[in-house]
């Protein structure tokens, strides 16, 4: 019997009622009004800029529409217009399993709210998440893909769920070396990732603002580090809040794939450019992924895949919180063998 926690993965979802936000753009510094509206099945996440002429103001949230990755993820459209800082909202949609929504903003940037995704998550949950009765597809990673830029690298590996493993290493005393690894589900996302805030360094602020960036940044919407120490009076929400925010960003950037990814994202010192380049590399090689119906995977209908071998959703539901490393390894080995059969891999194909 399939665990009840997995049922939401079978079909697409939207929100049950509209949501409104008023906030500041992190980089533009402009006041922004944003509304999020329910949307029909198979429409995906779309954005509209209400300050632009009709017919030129629509943006589609897809990997190949990204046109800027400096300090945020920026979408563009065929008319040459841009919409910046979409990653935190996309992360919230993805983390909660929302496939379809229409977002309207009255400026060039999504509001930063408190620098995390938690205000979005809270509002989306309060609005209600509504199933649409339409099957959901998943993008299953078949073969590893990896990209490296200097000391930074990122890769996607076959796995039973969306798992993120991120490491960062900063010389600032209050950051240092931090690592995080977890399966992503609505529960784990809301509890462990969504409230982690973006961060910046006091020594960079003047230079960024000269370039028209970080004009709306403050300790109200970011962690500020000064001389290596956290300057925010309230301190950190997690001891490793910095790497948790990197995971939050990665989930938002990966949400630009054409369907929710089932695979293991691993990265060292990632950024928005690295994440988007990884998606571009993935999509350029059709051997590295397969688009499948979520229900078929969950029900074991694809070449006899047993539903218990593809525990999508909660890490506790997959292994149990007290499962030993040896048992985990045995389960993963069994799962990988099943996945090889499902995807038609032979021993010679296995990376």
Give residue spans per PLM region.
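C-terminal regulatory domains involved in ligand/effector binding and gene-expression control
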Residues: 1-100, 104-351
């Amino acid at each position: 019997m399939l665990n009840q926690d997995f049922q939401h993965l079978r079909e697409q979802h939207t929100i049950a009622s509209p949501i409104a936000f008023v906030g500041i753009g992190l980089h533009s510094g402009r006041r922004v009004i944003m509304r999020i509206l329910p949307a029909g099945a198979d429409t995906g996440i779309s954005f509209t800029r209400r300050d632009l002429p009709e017919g030129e103001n629509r943006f589609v949230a897809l990997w190949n529409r990204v046109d800027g990755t400096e300090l945020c993820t920026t979408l563009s459209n065929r008319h040459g217009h841009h919409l910046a800082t979409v990653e935190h909202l996309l992360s919230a949609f993805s983390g909660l399993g929302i496939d379809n929504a229409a977002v309207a903003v009255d400026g060039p940037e999504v509001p930063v709210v408190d620098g995390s995704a938690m205000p979005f998550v809270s509002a989306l949950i309060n609005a209600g998440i509504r199933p649409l009765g339409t099957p959901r597809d998943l993008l299953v990673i078949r073969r590893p893909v990896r990209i490296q830029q200097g000391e930074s690298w990122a890769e996607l590996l076959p796995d039973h769920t969306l798992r993120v493993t991120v490491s960062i290493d900063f010389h600032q005393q209050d950051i240092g070396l931090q690592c995080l690894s977890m399966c992503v589900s609505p529960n784990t996302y809301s509890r462990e990732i969504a409230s982690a805030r973006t961060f910046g360094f006091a020594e960079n602020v003047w230079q960024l603002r000269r370039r028209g960036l970080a004009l709306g940044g403050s300790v109200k919407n970011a962690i500020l580090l000064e001389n290596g120490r956290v300057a925010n009076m309230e301190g950190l929400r997690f001891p490793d809040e910095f790497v948790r925010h990197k995971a939050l960003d990665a989930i938002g950037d990966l949400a630009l794939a054409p369907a929710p990814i089932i695979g293991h994202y691993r990265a060292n010192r990632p950024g928005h450019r690295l994440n988007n380049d990884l998606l571009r590399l993935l999509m350029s090689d059709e051997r590295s992924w397969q688009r499948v119906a979520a229900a078929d995977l969950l029900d074991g209908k694809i070449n006899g895949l047993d539903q218990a071998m593809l525990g999508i959703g909660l890490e506790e539901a997959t292994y149990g919180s007290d499962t030993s490393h040896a048992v985990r390894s045995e389960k993963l080995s069994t799962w990988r063998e099943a996945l090889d059969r499902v995807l038609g891999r032979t021993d010679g194909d296995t990376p």
